Structure formats: structure tokens, C-alpha cells
């Protein structure tokens, strides 16, 4: 159940940046390939501020929650004419959690490409504002990604800041 009353696209295309071609593919209930992303302590720390790997049960609960709150997508990159999942993102007006699961792809602008496309999605849906519920102070990559897209911190939280973008 994505956003109430809104039909979630199967695919959201993202404009190519240099040699990088991405797309967002609608969550279909299959996520075993993503488990390895959530085993990496550095990745988990960026998400939770902790380093304990996710169990399959926890991963399933996370994806079920996200799928019931917004439009859940896998971020896919085109490699050798094949679409390969490299992360996930969920879009709804109140939050936009994103994970680039492949650590070798972080810092290359993939997150910015995804966030720009989801800002466009928000505009298509007529939203006047978009929010990020919280970015931990230690997650400099995520802070940089959302700031680059125009999001501004507006409220301090226990571990970081809430962000808002006026559309």
C-alpha cells in the first residue's frame, strides 16, 4: 500500500549522469538480494547509528513498514546491459529514507540523482513541501546529498536534524 489514492509507477526513470544510468523499480516483495547491504556495519551505522547487522526478519519488517508508508523502490544501476539493485529508497511527503547498499558506489552522486528524481515526483503529485524525518549528525553523506538538493535543517532531533524542502 503506497501513498493513499496514488498509483505508484513500476519504474521511475532517472536522467543519465555521465556514464551512470539509474532507475527506481517498484518494490515487489522480493528483497533477499538486499540482505548483504544490511550486514555491513558501516552501512547499518549510517541508518541506525548502531552496527548490529539486520536479520532477515528485521529486514522484512523494515520493508513491510516502508511499503505501507510510501512508495518503496529499489535503486538499480545499468551494468553490462543488466539492471542491478544497489540500494533502496522510500518516498512519501513526510520522509525519504535512502540507502546506497553498495559501499563502492557511495560518494558518486547516486543519492543526489535519486533525490532529484523524487523531488520531481513530489512536484508531479502537487506537494508544496517535502520532509526528511531525521538525518543523523554522523551521516555526512546524507546531509550533503539532501542539502545539495535544497533541503534545509529546521528542527534538532536527539541524533541529528529534521529537514524540509519548499517546492
Please describe what each predicted stretch is.
Residues 1-61:
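A short, well-structured alpha-helix characteristic of acyl/acetyltransferase catalytic modules
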Residues 76, 95-110, 135-136:
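A short, internal acetyl-CoA/4′-phosphopantetheine-binding micro-motif in the GNAT/acyltransferase core
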Residues 106, 115-123, 147:
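A conserved short alpha-helix in the GNAT/GCN5 acetyltransferase fold that borders
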Residues 156-167:
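C-terminal "cap" of GNAT-fold acetyltransferases
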Amino acid at each position: 500500500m503506497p501513498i493513499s489514492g496514488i498509483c505508484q509507477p513500476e519504474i521511475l526513470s532517472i536522467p543519465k549522469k555521465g556514464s551512470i544510468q539509474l532507475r527506481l523499480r517498484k518494490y515487489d516483495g522480493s528483497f533477499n538480494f538486499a540482505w548483504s547491504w544490511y550486514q555491513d556495519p558501516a552501512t547499518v551505522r549510517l541508518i541506525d547509528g548502531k552496527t548490529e547487522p539486520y536479520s532477515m526478519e528485521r529486514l522484512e519488517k523494515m520493508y513491510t513498514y516502508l511499503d505501507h508508508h510510501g512508495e518503496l523502490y529499489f535503486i538499480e544501476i545499468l551494468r553490462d546491459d543488466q539492471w542491478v539493485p544497489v540500494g533502496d529508497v522510500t518516498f512519501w511527503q513526510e520522509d525519504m529514507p535512502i540507502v546506497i547498499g553498495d559501499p563502492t558506489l557511495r560518494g558518486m552522486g547516486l543519492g543526489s540523482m535519486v533525490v532529484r528524481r523524487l523531488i520531481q515526483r513530489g512536484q508531479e503529485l502537487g506537494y508544496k513541501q517535502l520532509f526528511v524525518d531525521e538525518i543523523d549528525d554522523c551521516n555526512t553523506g546524507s546531509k550533503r546529498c539532501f542539502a545539495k538538493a535544497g533541503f534545509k535543517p529546521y528542527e534538532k532531533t536527539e541524533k541529528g536534524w529534521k529537514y524540509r524542502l519548499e517546492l
